Amino acid sequence: MKSQTSGYVDPQTEEYDESREKSYQVLIAVSGVLSITSLLILVLFVPSMYNYVDNISRFSRRDFEFCQASANDLETEMMSVREGLLRGRNVTKRAAGYGHYNPSMLAADSPQFQECPACCIPGERGPSGDSGLPALPGAPGPDGAPGRPGTTPNASCIPERVFEPPPCLPCPQGPRGVPGHPGFPGDPGEYGIGGRPGSDGMPGKPGDPGLAGPIGPPGESGPIGDKGRTPEAHVIPGPPGDSGLPGPWGPPGSAGMPGEDGYAGTPGEKGWPGPPGAPGPGGMPGPNGPTGEQGPSGTPGTCVCQDTEVVMNDEKGRVPAPRDNVAPGATGGSYEPQGGNDAAAPSAISQSQNRRIRKW
């Protein structure tokens, strides 16, 4: 804290200002580091989080599609099992109608599908499936119960002319199923063997010209050449050359005429008060003051007569001289004490004292 009248600085205030400035600097540095760190974390975290969420959504979508495909396959299998159960109920007797004409018989290599309970009409031949694995021979099953008599599409079948169809041949293999769900990406493989070094590339194009270098120093002056020939024709003077450099300063000139007086300056500020001066000479004596009031009357004194001596006590307790020492002709009662060293002693006594002296 600096005073306006002096350059005094409080050391405690200066130390407090320095400590506060250092604390502000530390706070600014910490806030800057935290801001930069948060920005770096944001830049690195947001892309990785987006990639992670994208992978999870893609895998979830694939799993959902796989579940949907599995559900469709199960539904297809259930339908095929149901058709197999329905197809197993229509069992015909073996070798029925052998040697008789049966209009529903087809070639041996063409499978037929029979459905209940009317006469079966073979459908179109399906596409050939892939070759399956050879199966083990199964055990012969028991004979089935005889089926119900069939009917013609337009009228009832005559019992005498109803011929049992031959047993159903095994159906061909069905078409290939829907491709499965793609699997998850495998682990990264090992590093392969390093390839052969490549051949040298084509030479590159020449580079662009570089920047102009700095101006070099001036060269040395060459030798003076030979004098040229004097022209035969009239010499035409050339244009004047450039002005030369200014010459050096000349000697100082003589003193000039004194100039006119300048304007009066503004009055200066009031100076500080000077030291006190010497004391002045004494003044003239003043006039006499007014007469004071009359004082109160004094107390009566005492008189002790002893061997022709008079002892009197005045107001100040002084003892007067004997009667013999009174100057002759002092009939008015005035006396002077012996040993008049006291300049302030009174020159007269009161009337009561004079009466006592006269009586004595």
UniProtKB/Swiss-Prot annotation:
Residues 127-158, 174-360 are annotated as: Disordered. This is Cuticle collagen dpy-2. Residues 242-258 have a biased composition (Low complexity). Belongs to the cuticular collagen family. Changing residue 253 to R: In dpy2(Q292). Changing residue 247 to R: In dpy2(E489). Nematode cuticles are composed largely of collagen-like proteins. The cuticle functions both as an exoskeleton and as a barrier to protect the worm from its environment. Mutations in dpy-2 affects the body shape. Residues 189-198 have a biased composition (Gly residues). GO terms for biological process: cuticle development involved in collagen and cuticulin-based cuticle molting cycle; post-embryonic body morphogenesis; regulation of multicellular organism growth. Keywords: Collagen, Cuticle, Disulfide bond, Repeat, Signal.
